[in-house]
């Protein structure tokens, strides 16, 4: 089923309309933690007075609120968050729930053709499988053969040492719980600092960003996490910004990274750090310009991580 609306706010009314047209009694959905999306979902539930609405935390392993300080506040530093997260996880690893059987519906066309009105990109989609079966196979292959060596290989962009699962995670093709279960099945010592633990850290970083965004909604509003950085006097230099975007700064690793981004829609994690740092600390260009450009190009674009 596909419905198109003119703007984000209209999505509430269209959900109400679809529910009415199909005599819906229960609505199940997955939580999104961005501030606008959370407000939308609250409004949907208020609008659907006669529909039972149930939300689920599918994009995290432990939901926001599960890992807090002794004062019941959100952690602001990763390492103590990670330690508390691991302690909480050892109490019981959340299970992956099997998908329910599909029930037929005469009013919903399973072969619906959808035309999306935005420019197509010329990226090589072979690197980013959209089928769940292919993503699961890629996950299994990495956990068997790559996760144990990730600590040694992750710092070298020329080496195929990362999982390349970020696009599947960003679009929901894979869940982080699937990643965790496969990792522990192949590398059971990962939870206790053994082989695979460094890649597990990456999953925890992903959790950290989402928990932060939930408890500090200003992060969704182009505000900095560290307050004093809002007083930095950024340079307005369209020439430098364009050179950075096009990979023409004259700094080889920065330029190679940005050209990789522009041609493939993806960039190695270390290169994301290098190019972002160069833009902000060397060119003194507002980080929001970089954030905007990354999100316009990344096939795995993710607001929390970005």
Question: Residue ranges of each PLM-predicted region?
Answer:
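Glycine-rich loops and low-complexity Gly/Arg-rich segments
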Residues: 26, 52-54, 78-81, 102-105, ...
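Trp/Phe/Arg-rich N-terminal binding region typifying the photolyase-homology
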Residues: 1-93, 195, 259, 305
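An acidic- and aromatic-residue-enriched active-site/binding cleft used to recognize and process polar
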Residues: 32-34, 58-59, 83, 155, ...
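Active-site-proximal binding-pocket segments
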Residues: 160-306
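Soluble or luminal CAZymes and related metallo-dependent hydrolases
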Residues: 36, 131, 249, 253
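Glycine/tryptophan-enriched, flexible segments
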Residues: 16, 72-226
């Amino acid at each position: 089923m596909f419905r198109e609306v003119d703007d984000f706010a209209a999505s509430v009314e269209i959900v109400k309309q679809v529910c009415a047209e199909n005599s819906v009694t229960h609505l199940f959905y997955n939580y999104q933690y961005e501030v606008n999306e959370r407000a939308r979902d609250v409004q949907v539930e208020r609008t659907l007075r006669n529909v039972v609405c149930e939300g689920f935390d599918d994009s995290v392993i432990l939901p926001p609120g599960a890992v807090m300080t002794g004062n019941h506040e959100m952690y602001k530093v990763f390492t103590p968050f990670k330690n508390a997260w691991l302690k909480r996880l050892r109490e019981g690893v959340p299970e992956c729930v099997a998908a329910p059987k599909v029930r037929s519906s005469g009013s919903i066309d399973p072969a619906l053709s959808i035309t999306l009105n935005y420019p197509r990109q010329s990226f090589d989609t072979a690197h980013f499988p959209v089928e769940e079966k292919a993503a699961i196979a890629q996950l299994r292959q990495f956990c068997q053969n790559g996760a144990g060596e990730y600590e040694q290989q992750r710092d070298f962009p020329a080496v195929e040492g990362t999982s390349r699962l970020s696009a599947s995670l960003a679009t929901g093709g894979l869940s982080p719980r699937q990643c965790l279960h496969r990792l522990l099945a192949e590398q059971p010592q990962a939870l206790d600092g053994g082989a695979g633990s460094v890649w597990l850290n990456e999953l925890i970083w992903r959790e950290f960003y989402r928990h932060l965004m939930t408890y500090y909604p200003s992060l969704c509003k182009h505000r900095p996490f560290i307050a004093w950085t809002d007083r930095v006097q950024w340079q307005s230099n369209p020439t430098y910004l364009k050179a950075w975007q096009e990979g023409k700064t004259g700094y080889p690793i920065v330029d190679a990274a940005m050209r990789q981004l522009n041609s493939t829609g993806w960039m190695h994690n270390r290169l994301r750090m290098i190019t972002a740092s160069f833009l902000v600390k060397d060119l003194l260009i507002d980080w929001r310009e970089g954030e905007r450009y990354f999100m316009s190009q990344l096939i795995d674009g993710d607001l929390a991580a970005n």
